[in-house]
A protein has these predicted regions:
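C-terminal helicase lobe and adjacent C-terminal extensions/tails of nucleic-acid helicase motors
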Residues: 335, 354, 369-375, 391-442
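P-loop NTPase motor module signature
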Residues: 1-399
Length: 442
């Protein structure tokens, strides 16, 4: 299903499928981010006049709101992989919807491949749907053996604004974004959504803007490491005056911030790239693709006509890549290889939109053999099955399995977010901050 931002894919399609009685089982919808999963479930529940957890619920790592009466369950992508590994026939599940499939995360690609095998071998009644506003639909439709349905939806017009000339090398990126935001603020009405690559850039732009905007303008950061309550506050309408939401790509898809009429796109995105030197992924900052720029601009046209200010020129726009790379091409395949081994099939036995590169998969399998997760023939070991139960990189899971619970805090610091990142303190104080996040240590 292809439809522009604001057409109603995320919040209308599951409810329409339920109303049409297309399946007697539960409808499972995958979202790439936890905030989007909760927000989508809450919006659908609000639409039908029920609290979350009745007909519509959600399940993400660490929390869930579902009940025996739940018919639509919104989950993050890793949840589906775990469900398939535990019960391959997906009992009580009638349909699986892959929302925002253009992001092509490893979990989404693997989940679709496993679901296709389940549908072919065990569940010929299982309905599979892939949705996006910017999907390269042809290859996906071919793998799914499914028709492409395109809807124009009812997104509002968004007027693009480009820079007159490329940014001078003497101007810092954050300053350029702040300048563009101030221009947009003076030329338009309504609240503003500013896209930045990461938390550091958000804080620096925040510092540049806070003394230049008027008292009726609220600045609201929005990034993945924030608590959910703070994220909810950021996407809520401004209580008075205007709001400037400074966000990472967390706000790129599946979210509607009601009073946003203006988008400022910094033109950069942060993605995970596999680093052979460290054997793990690292975050790199790259130019956005046309697909990502389209998604971002669409945030300004969700509820009314809007404007999108791009921090690049019209000429530079034509040089953007069409789509971001699939994670299966650029990311770390160690966890992916472990899941395949638990499943018991090689990649050649599954239908992937983009098959994994043989050499990079072999490297990942070699790491798993070194950790004791695979035997010499590449088969899963009991230790490997234990590693697969952790929502962690296999290296960190191995550390916990080997060193015991004392290693859990170090794994949490490495896998999630150091609460004292950027502060020069020793490990003991960092773990203390992790145990007591409300305690003031500095």
């Amino acid at each position: 299903l292809q439809a522009p931002p604001g057409a109603g894919k995320t919040t209308r399609v599951p409810l329409a499928m339920l109303d049409a009685n297309l399946t007697t089982g539960k409808i499972l919808m995958l979202e790439p981010r936890r905030l989007a999963a909760r927000a989508a479930a809450e919006r659908m529940a609000e639409t039908i006049g029920e609290p979350v957890g009745n007909t519509v619920g959600y399940r993400i790592r660490g929390t869930s709101k579902i009940s025996k009466s739940t018919k639509i369950e919104v989950v993050t992508e890793g949840i589906l992989t775990r469900m398939l590994q535990d019960q391959p026939d997906l009992p009580n599940i009638g349909a699986v919807i892959f929302d925002e499939f253009h992001e092509r995360s490893l979990n989404a690609d693997l989940g679709l491949a496993l679901c296709l095998e389940v549908a072919g071998a065990l569940r010929d009644d299982l309905l599979l749907v892939a949705m996006s506003a910017t999907l390269d639909a042809g290859p996906i439709a071919e793998v799914m053996n499914a028709p492409i349905v395109t809807s124009e939806g009812r997104a509002f017009d968004v007027t693009p604004h480009w820079l007159d000339k490329p940014l001078a090398k003497t101007i810092r990126f954050e300053q350029a974004v702040a300048n563009t935001t101030l221009s947009a603020l003076s030329e338009t009405t309504g609240s503003v959504l500013v896209f930045l690559p990461g938390e550091g850039e958000i804080r620096r732009v925040h510092n540049l803007l806070e003394h230049q905007v008027t008292s009726d303008v609220t600045l609201a950061p929005l990034f993945g490491a924030m608590g959910f309550a703070a994220q909810r506050e950021a996407i809520a309408p401004a209580k008075q005056g205007r709001k400037i939401v400074l966000a990472t790509s967390i706000a790129e898809t599946s979210l509607t911030i009601p009073d946003i009429k203006v988008v400022v796109d910094g033109g950069k995105s942060r993605r995970a790239r596999f680093d052979p030197a460290s054997g793990m992924s690292r975050l790199v900052t790259e130019r956005v693709t046309r697909a990502e720029a389209t998604q971002r601009a669409g945030r300004a046209g969700r509820v009314q006509a809007g404007d999108c200010y791009k921090v690049w020129t019209r000429g530079e726009d034509g040089a953007l890549a069409a789509y971001p790379p699939a994670e299966i091409d650029a990311g770390d395949l160690t966890g992916f290889a472990l899941e395949l081994a638990v499943w018991g099939s090689g990649p050649e036995a599954l239908q992937f939109v983009t098959p994994p590169h043989a050499g990079r998969l072999a490297e990942a399998q070699a790491v798993l053999q070194m950790l004791g997760g695979l035997d010499a023939k590449g088969r899963i070991t009991p230790h490997g099955r234990a590693l697969s139960r952790y929502p962690l990189h296999p290296r960190l899971a191995h550390m916990i399995e080997t060193a015991g619970s004392n290693a859990a805090e170090v794994a949490a610091l490495l896998a999630e977010r150091d609460p004292l990142r950027g502060v020069s303190v020793d490990l003991s104080l960092r773990t203390q901050a992790l145990r007591n996040p409300k305690q003031k240590l500095l």
